[in-house]
A protein has these predicted regions:
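Cyclic-nucleotide recognition modules
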Residues: 14, 56-115
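Short, small/polar residue-rich loop motifs at catalytic or cofactor-binding pockets
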Residues: 13-14, 31-34, 51
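Cyclic nucleotide-binding regulatory module and flanking cytosolic helices
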Residues: 1-25, 98, 102
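Glycine- and acidic-residue-biased ligand/ion/polar-headgroup-sensing regions
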Residues: 24, 35-51, 60-62
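Polybasic "coupling" helices that flank or enter modular domains
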Residues: 82, 108-154
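Conserved short histidine dyad/triad with adjacent acidic residue
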Residues: 17-32, 57-60
């Protein structure tokens, strides 16, 4: 259970403006600086980075754009609507600075990601980090290790 459940976050942001997207529309573009924080109200989006599909998000209350906002850098992934999608949208810097409920939710989400990366790192080191593993795998493991230690992402 999260400190701020997605359903509670949805109730909290219901006064934010909404934006509707058609299938195929880009919500977040890698390399761009939108300055926006999006909260999925309904629909389904696909996330990819550098042409690699990372997954599909269809959970109402999912947050998009938080990493770019927190790190003050361009988005690192593309997010595209896979179905008709509606998101709440707000200025990321303002919300993260002034709204403790949203900031706490983002912190929990990021902590969960670091936890998953840590588990993945341990599993990679157990299975593929020893003798006989390719140099590329070893480099990827080290990059992931640095990301976990620094609290960031690879």
């Amino acid at each position: 259970m999260s400190l701020v459940e997605s359903s509670a976050l949805l109730r909290h942001v219901r006064g934010w403006p909404t934006v509707s997207f058609r299938p195929g529309d880009v919500l977040v573009q890698s390399g761009a600086r939108s300055g926006k924080l999006l909260v999925l109200k309904e629909g389904r989006v696909e996330v990819s980075s550098q042409g690699v599909a990372l997954g599909t998000i269809d959970t109402p209350g999912a947050i998009l754009g938080e990493m770019a906002a927190l790190l003050e850098r361009p988005h690192t992934a593309d997010v595209r609507a896979a179905a008709a999608t509606v998101c709440y949208v707000a200025d990321a810097a303002t919300v993260l600075r002034e709204d403790p409920v949203v900031a706490l939710h983002v912190a929990v989400v990021l902590a969960q990601r670091v936890d998953l990366h840590t588990e993945a790192l341990v599993e990679l080191k157990r299975k593929g980090g020893g003798a006989g593993a390719g140099k590329a795998i070893d480099q990827s493991i080290e990059q992931l290790a640095k990301a976990v230690v620094l609290g960031g992402v690879a």
